[in-house]
Regions:
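Phosphate-binding and adjacent anionic-ligand microenvironments
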Residues: 286, 290-292, 313, 333-530, ...
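Conserved phosphate/anionic-ligand binding catalytic regions in large, soluble enzymes, centered on
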Residues: 37-57, 141-144, 231-243, 298, ...
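An N-terminal, well-structured beta->alpha segment
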Residues: 5-101, 190, 195-227, 235
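Gly/Ser/Thr-enriched, mixed-charge loops and adjacent short helices
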Residues: 10-14, 32-37, 41, 149-277, ...
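Short acidic, glycine/serine/threonine-rich loops at helix termini
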Residues: 95-100, 125-129, 147-153, 174, ...
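N-terminal small/polar loop signature for handling phosphorylated ligands or for N-terminal nucleophile
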Residues: 85-148, 245-246, 250-304
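Buried hydrophobic positions in well-ordered alpha/beta secondary-structure cores of metabolic enzymes
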Residues: 46, 86, 124, 137, ...
């Protein structure tokens, strides 16, 4: 079907009056018709994410139901436990979509647990494992703008779905009609016992599990730490207060962002990676006692921090900087207690700062680099678990503000990360220092590794094709230098080949194939290019290494300028 065929198919369906009116309002808007009906919203390992609205290429109760039916059909075809867990965030329609998913699972005879209120994404990962489920779903679009929502899908280990089951779910979805009516209502399945709410007991078990990951809780209780916290109108408010409150942290909450708000009126793009995400926090922190600012994204799997600079302003750490600062803190504290097991590992994504490798090596711990996506960090935990050695996982992080200590969940967790940030800040406060002081010491000790992430966003109906062409052009035309530094090696993760340009020697990359290209600049740094898995854009990850911060910054600026042309 072309886009008009799809549009007419929807117009002829038995739909609620408000949806019919929405469809009628775009009848003469060709661009809107193509956007909404140019295809079906795609399902992948991250599930589905898109703008909410009527249409086959939009997120609505029909596309969500179809995706959940595909998940249910896949689960029914496996030997996995016929149980599912579902969570949802603060976005518009999140609770509705969660209930739609629950009904789809119940129709397939799958016992379904649904969080009784909005909950962070890592709590869903925890629930899948704790309740022994075969799969899980979170309704969330993470840090996207308010017009978006999504369906994040999880496997039995609490990781986001891997390629093989996701491909099967996609195939199942393709066989399902859009408008198959529900056999029973949500309330009827609740009465039947096929759908059950996840109540306070599991929340408390999660809190205790997170608290058990504290490195030095008594130290934190005695530090008198003051933080300013924003949940960015999302799910972090309750669990962050519960965990940090038990540890004696004094919390000032940003009032205008404390309550759930699907419009995100005070922060249009609630992404903790951006400077603007903490703007309201800066205002509050000027008049409140503050050792550190914490901000969690709407589904509370990512966290960002800022620290007072001593001159009335604040310095926001990058996701990389917070990652290697937490890594250094955990390794230093556990080394002091002689508490690091032999063969211990830490894990980072390939696009995260290699400065972390130097920190891990200093403490005699292996650092593994995996593909982007926290499921690959979770995969390393699974390997240890299969050997009966899960305690050897120390810490994992991604530069996009995602961190995990512990094996209770298999996705990044802003709650445990917030606790670790407070521990780090408290330990430094007791020494008369702050996180900025410690960051300067880390750079001085391990080297000046400066990082920058650049997103090139593409537009138009063929935006994804443009992203693919950009990657193909980079493969075909390898630059001799970037920012004045010679390109010494090229790693093509799609071909699983690393090539030394001087010798021509090729080696195999022992990672799953992925559309990622890395240019190594010897000991000067690297540039990595990868298309987004969910949006029409290509991301460039820069690392520049210098003898001092000024040299590293000069190289970084030259690298970005060249690749931006």
């Amino acid at each position: 079907m072309n886009y008009m065929d799809r549009y007419n198919f929807w117009c002829q369906a038995d739909l609620p009056e408000e949806i019919k009116q929405e469809l009628a309002s775009i009848r003469n808007d060709e661009e809107e018709l193509k956007g909404r009906f140019g295809g079906d919203l795609q399902f992948g390992t991250a599930g589905m994410r898109g703008i909410m609205g009527a249409g086959s290429n939009r997120l609505n109760r029909y596309t969500v139901r179809r995706a959940a039916q595909g998940m249910a059909a896949w689960l029914s075809s496996t030997d996995l436990p016929q149980k599912a867990a579902i969570g949802y965030d603060s976005r518009h329609n999140s609770q509705l979509f969660a209930e739609v998913c629950a009904v789809a699972f119940a129709e397939a005879g799958i016992q379904t647990w649904l969080y009784d209120r909005l909950a962070p994404t890592p709590m869903l990962s925890y629930a899948v494992r704790e309740l022994g489920c075969g799969c899980g779903i979170v309704i969330s679009a993470s840090h996207n703008a308010g017009a978006y929502n999504g369906v994040k899908c999880y496997g039995p280990d609490g990781c986001q779905m891997t390629d093989e089951p996701a491909a099967i779910v996609t195939e199942k979805i393709s066989t399902i009609d859009f408008f198959v009516p529900e056999t029973k209502s949500f309330a009827e399945y609740m009465a039947d016992g096929l759908i059950t709410y996840i109540g306070q007991d599991l929340w408390e078990r999660y809190y205790e599990t997170v608290l058990a990951e504290a490195v030095d809780p008594e130290m934190l209780k005695n530090a008198g730490l003051n933080i300013v916290y924003t949940p960015l109108c999302g799910t972090g408010m309750e669990p962050v207060h519960a965990v940090l409150g038990k540890l004696g942290v004094n919390i000032t909450t940003v009032a205008c962002q404390a309550k759930p708000d699907g419009d995100f009126k005070t922060c249009e793009y609630p992404n903790p990676e951006t400077d603007a995400a903490l703007n309201e926090s800066y205002k509050v922190a000027k008049d409140a006692p503050c050792d550190v600012i914490l901000g969690t994204d709407p589904d509370a799997d990512r966290v960002a921090i800022a620290v007072p600079d001593g001159q009335g302003g604040f310095v926001k750490l990058s996701g990389n900087e917070l990652g290697f600062m937490l890594l250094d803190y955990v390794l230093k504290a556990r080394t002091a207690k002689n508490d690091i097991p032999e063969g211990a590992i830490t894990v980072r994504s390939i696009v995260s700062s290699p400065l972390a490798d130097r920190i891990a090596a200093y403490y005699g711990v292996t650092m593994k680099a995996v593909l982007t996506g926290f499921k690959y960090i979770g995969g390393e935990i699974l390997k240890l678990e299969q050997k009966g050695e899960p305690e050897k996982f120390i810490f994992g992080f991604e530069e996009s503000c995602g961190y995990l200590k512990g094996t209770y969940a298999r996705d990044k967790d802003a709650i445990v990360a917030s606790m670790l940030v407070c521990e780090l800040a408290a330990s430094l406060k007791l020494q008369g220092k702050n996180i900025l002081d410690a960051l300067a010491e880390v750079y001085q000790k391990y080297g000046f590794y400066l990082a920058h992430v650049q997103s090139i966003e593409l537009t138009g109906a063929d935006a994804m094709e443009k992203a693919a062409k950009m990657m193909a052009d980079l493969r075909a035309q390898v630059p001799a230098t970037i920012g004045g530094a010679a390109v010494t090696d090229v790693r093509d993760y799609k071909a699983s080949i690393a090539k030394n340009l001087a010798t021509g020697e090729k080696t195999v990359i022992d990672l799953p194939k992925s559309n990622v290209l890395e240019f190594l600049l010897g000991d000067k740094g690297s540039v990595i290019a990868r298309p987004s898995g969910t949006e029409p854009k290509v991301k460039f990850y820069y690392t520049a290494v210098g003898e001092n911060k000024e040299d590293a910054k000069k190289l970084l600026d030259a690298m970005v300028a060249q690749m931006s042309v």
